[in-house]
Amino acid sequence: MTDFKTIIARLAEGRALDAAEARAAFEIVMSGEATQAQIGAFLMGLRVRGETVAEITAGATVMRERALRVTAPANAIDIVGTGGDGVGTWNISTATALVVAAAGVPVAKHGNRKASSLSGTADALQALGVNLDIDPATIAASIEKAGIGFMFAQAHHAAMKHVAPVRADLGIKTIFNMLGPLSNPALVKRQLLGVFAAEWVKPFAEALRNLGSDSAWVVHGSDGMDELTTTGPSAVAELKGGSIRVFEVTPEDAGLPRASIEDLKGGDPEQNAAAIRRLLDGEAGAYRDIVLLNTAAALIVSGKAATLKEGAGLAAKAIDSGAAKQTLAKLVAATNGKNNV
């Protein structure tokens, strides 16, 4: 096995790690065999030089192998972002996940508490009454009954406890900010994945291809959002059939108006939960529009829609029919041990 000091020495020279070296390094880190100082040096060495697709793939592979697994249908999708975009919007991926499920696509959503906003996916779902403290069998049953299940990252990646103190002490983005969205415990092969910078859309798509995904959109909004934005264009790297295509989309492609970033600013978990409820009740406005856009993308990834315009229409129908509101009610019931779903 590669010695961890040797790996750190290679990083200190500015060298990229090959797949075997990177895998060995993450095995050492995630098994608790590295000291806190070594982990800090490792993370900083990667960050200063710039993380490679091979290193990201290796880290995500090790995290997936060590995760507490969940069973999900083969056509399930994850709708997830790296977080840390600093924009502080409403919970867009959370609301999108509910609408996608209501449109008939099973969702195995992986997420955590807030990164840079006031409210992360876990915070908002908890405020909506979803029980996060459930076992893999209950999550699988939730996906079956409600069409959606939520996997709380910290409950599924126990090995992260070895790096948590160092990450907190460093206070900067590290490779682990990238690995979470790539480490879905249900091993889904379809993703709508938002990243914190445009230069990462293609590398993330390449990593997803390496990890076995068959269909994905990796996106970044021109306003900095780790979502498709309605304030302007968004960069997209599409993975389909083993090929990656990079292009740009606008809200107009989905027949939607542009919004200002102020219209999309979120609040604390309770405020964001209330906004989701209003959205599911059919409230019009900028929040609904951005959820329609992101749902449309997820429906393209899932093969349910051919275009953003078609997908946005299906998303609107899922909300206006009451199906999305019912999906939330089913999710709350399924995670709280109630059978009336």
Curated annotation (Swiss-Prot):
Keywords: Amino-acid biosynthesis, Aromatic amino acid biosynthesis, Glycosyltransferase, Magnesium, Metal-binding, Transferase, Tryptophan biosynthesis
Gene Ontology terms, MF aspect: anthranilate phosphoribosyltransferase activity; magnesium ion binding
Recorded superkingdom: Bacteria
Binding site for Mg(2+) 1: S93, E227
Binding site for Mg(2+) 2: D226, E227
Example of a GO cellular component annotation carried by this entry: cytosol
Cofactor details (free text): Binds 2 magnesium ions per monomer.
InterPro entries reported in the protein's UniProt record: Anthranilate_Pribosyl_Tfrase, Glycosyl_Trfase_fam3, Glycosyl_Trfase_fam3_N_dom, Glycosyl_Trfase_fam3_N_dom_sf, Nuc_phospho_transferase
Substrates-to-products reaction catalysed: N-(5-phospho-beta-D-ribosyl)anthranilate + diphosphate = 5-phospho-alpha-D-ribose 1-diphosphate + anthranilate
Residues reported in the UniProt entry to bind anthranilate 1: G81, N112
One GO BP: L-tryptophan biosynthetic process
UniProt EC number: 2.4.2.18
PANTHER family per record: ANTHRANILATE PHOSPHORIBOSYLTRANSFERASE (PTHR43285:SF2)
Its biological purpose: Catalyzes the transfer of the phosphoribosyl group of 5-phosphorylribose-1-pyrophosphate (PRPP) to anthranilate to yield N-(5'-phosphoribosyl)-anthranilate (PRA).
Record note on quaternary structure: Homodimer.
Similarity remark: Belongs to the anthranilate phosphoribosyltransferase family.
Name of the molecule in the record: Anthranilate phosphoribosyltransferase
Organism lineage: Bacteria, Pseudomonadati, Pseudomonadota, Alphaproteobacteria, Hyphomicrobiales
Protein's gene: trpD
